[in-house]
A protein has these predicted regions:
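Short, well-ordered alpha-helix to beta-strand connector turns
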Residues: 2, 24, 153-154
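Short alpha-helical segment within the catalytic ATP-binding CA
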Residues: 14-15, 48
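Conserved N-terminal helical subregion
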Residues: 51, 59-155
Length: 155
C-alpha cells in the first residue's frame, strides 16, 4: 500500500485525501492551522461543486452546514452598485449556487476521513522544506510548536 503526503487542508487537499484514503492508500494530511475557523475566500458552492461532492459520496457533509441560496450578483464601483445579475435558478430539481460556510465543510470532510483507518490528520504542522534523496522527492520536513519531523511517503 502506498503512502501519500498531502500538504494543505483546503478544498482540494481534503477531497484528495479522502478519495485516496477511501481507495486504500495511507494518507497523511498536514495543515498549518490548528482550526478550520478562519476567513476563507470563495465560499460559493456552484452546482458542479455539489455534483462533485455527490460523486465522492460526500453530499451528506453539506447537511447541517450554514448556507444560503445565491439569488443575484451585485457589482459595485466606487461604492455604487453599477449592475445586478440575477442568478439563473435552472430547471426544477437543478441545484442552485449556494454560499456556504467553507470551514464547516472542510471540517466535516476531515471528520469523515478520520473514520478511515489509513488516514491521519496533522493540524498545526507547518511545512519547512522538502525532503529528497538524489532526484527523488520523498516528503516534507514540518514543525509543530517545538517539534520537528520528516513526513515521508511514496507519492
Amino acid at each position: 500500500m502506498g503512502h501519500v503526503i498531502i500538504v494543505g487542508a483546503g478544498p482540494a487537499g481534503v477531497a484528495t485525501a479522502f478519495l485516496l484514503a477511501q481507495r486504500g492508500l495511507q494518507v497523511s494530511l498536514l495543515e498549518q492551522e490548528t482550526q478550520f475557523d478562519r476567513v476563507f475566500r470563495g465560499e460559493g458552492l456552484m452546482p458542479s461543486g455539489v455534483a462533485a461532492l455527490e460523486e465522492m459520496g460526500l453530499a451528506d457533509c453539506l447537511a447541517g452546514i450554514p448556507q444560503r441560496r445565491l439569488d443575484a450578483w451585485d457589482f459595485y464601483i466606487d461604492q455604487h452598485r453599477r449592475m445586478r445579475v440575477v442568478e439563473p435558478q435552472g430547471a426544477p430539481g437543478q441545484i442552485p449556487t449556494h454560499l456556504i460556510h467553507q470551514s464547516a465543510l472542510l471540517k466535516a470532510i476531515v471528520e469523515r476521513s478520520q473514520n478511515l483507518p489509513n488516514f491521519q490528520f496533522y493540524p498545526g504542522w507547518q511545512v519547512q522544506a522538502l525532503v529528497s534523496e538524489g532526484d527523488r522527492l520523498q516528503g516534507v520536513k514540518a514543525r509543530c510548536g517545538g517539534e520537528s519531523r520528516d513526513f515521508t511517503g511514496d507519492l
